């Protein structure tokens, strides 16, 4: 995760802003600079290579002292920064909005995946600039649209029906901020269209999840799509979701947290996110992840007859 201010800076032109991507040498200057505390939140002028991000975001970049940041010296950093600028420059951002826009925390890996989709000649985003920019504006939280299958970050499609598409995420192969744990495996489910979904299509998805992904929890980050994650990683997801939710509220970026379909979401996660929305502390919310929940009455009794036992997946074992 990183703020938009880690990728670009605003340049006032008439009554709105044009956004310009940072270059890696300017960032490198900022990372070595001694800056007064009072100037930590201001864009840094490298003198030689142009404007750099505010020094308060130093930890967002990979250095000798911090291996968890972005690999900003890779070509992918520039591609992501340029893509963000293209999207922001396609809309009007005024002086009253610019601080709020740049403070938004975004998924770096999501943006890298959109770059990969853009470069894939077989992908609809390669052929449609309008759809590409819509996808980016959704990814950076500047659109009220939810991420649907056409505007999704992408990955490897492992399941699809008339209503849903399930993707295997490819973060292990990333350049900008790769997942280093070689045991990482995670999926994302997007709706094909933002409209009511028939019970039969929900039933098909739940059957697939129950039999092929029975070692995983179905959760949501509140953005209109589902994530299918290992139970061992649920607590980590909870920390991130809670931190992003609080950060957005603090910065005035109040975005409705979409709890999604309770029949699909893991019961404990639904309790966690509901508690978070009510304003409870992280400690109180996380306790709900580890409590034994009273089983809801199964809205889809008989699902077990939809698959034979020899079809049960070993994924995640």
UniProtKB/Swiss-Prot annotation:
Any Pfam family matching the protein: Rota_NS35_N
**Cross-referenced Gene3D superfamilies:** Rotavirus NSP2 fragment, C-terminal domain, Rotavirus NSP2 fragment, N-terminal domain
User: Under which EC number(s) is this enzyme classified?
Assistant: 3.6.4.-
Any one Gene Ontology MF annotation carried by this entry is:
RNA binding
Disulfide bridge map? none
Binding site residues for ATP: 107-109, 188, 221-223, 227
Which residues does UniProt mark as catalytic?
Answer: 225 (for ntpase and rtpase activities)
- Would you kindly state one Gene Ontology biological process term found in this protein's UniProt entry? viral genome replication
Q: Which cofactor does it need?
A: Mg(2+)
Q: Where is this region: RNA-binding?
A: 205-241
Q: How does it assemble?
A: Homooctamer. Interacts with VP1; this interaction is weak. Interacts with NSP5; this interaction leads to up-regulation of NSP5 phosphorylation and formation of viral factories. Interacts with host DCP1A, DCP1B, DDX6, EDC4 and EIF2S1/eIF2-alpha; these interactions are probably part of the sequestration of some host SGs and PBs proteins in viral factories.
Family to which this protein belongs = Belongs to the rotavirus NSP2 family.
What this chain does, per the record?
Participates in replication and packaging of the viral genome. Plays a crucial role, together with NSP5, in the formation of virus factories (viroplasms), which are large inclusions in the host cytoplasm where replication intermediates are assembled and viral RNA replication takes place. Displays ssRNA binding, NTPase, RNA triphosphatase (RTPase) and ATP-independent helix-unwinding activities. The unwinding activity may prepare and organize plus-strand RNAs for packaging and replication by removing interfering secondary structures.
Supply the name of the protein. Answer: Non-structural protein 2
């Amino acid at each position: 995760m990183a703020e938009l201010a880690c990728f670009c800076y605003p340049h006032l032109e008439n009554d709105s802003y044009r956004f310009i991507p940072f270059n890696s040498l300017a960032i490198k200057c900022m990372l070595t600079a001694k800056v007064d505390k009072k100037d930590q939140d201001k864009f840094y002028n490298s003198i030689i290579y142009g404007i750099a991000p505010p020094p308060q975001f130093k930890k967002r970049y990979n250095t000798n002292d911090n291996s968890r940041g972005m690999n900003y010296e890779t070509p992918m950093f520039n591609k992501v920064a340029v893509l963000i600028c293209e999207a922001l420059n396609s809309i009007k951002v005024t002086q009253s909005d610019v601080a709020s826009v740049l403070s938004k925390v975004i998924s770096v890996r999501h943006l890298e995946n959109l770059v990969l989709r853009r470069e894939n000649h077989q992908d609809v985003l390669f052929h449609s600039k309008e759809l590409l920019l819509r996808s980016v504006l959704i990814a950076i939280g500047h659109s009220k649209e939810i991420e649907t299958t056409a505007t999704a970050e992408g990955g490897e499609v492992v399941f699809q029906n008339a209503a849903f598409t399930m993707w295997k995420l490819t973060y292990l192969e990333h350049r900008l901020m790769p997942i280093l744990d070689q045991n990482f495996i995670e999926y994302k489910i997007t709706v094909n269209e933002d409209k009511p979904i028939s019970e039969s299509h929900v039933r098909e998805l739940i059957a697939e999840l129950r039999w092929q992904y029975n070692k995983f929890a179905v959760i949501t980050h509140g953005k209109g799509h589902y994530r299918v994650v290992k139970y061992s990683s649920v607590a980590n997801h909870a920390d991130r979701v809670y931190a992003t939710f609080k950060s957005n509220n603090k910065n005035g970026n109040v975005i409705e947290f979409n709890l999604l379909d309770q029949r699909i979401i893991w019961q404990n996660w639904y309790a966690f996110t509901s508690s978070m929305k009510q304003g409870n502390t992280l400690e109180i919310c996380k306790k709900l992840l580890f409590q034994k929940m009273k089983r809801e009455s199964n809205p889809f009794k008989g699902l077990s007859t939809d698959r034979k036992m020899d079809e049960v997946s070993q994924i995640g074992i």
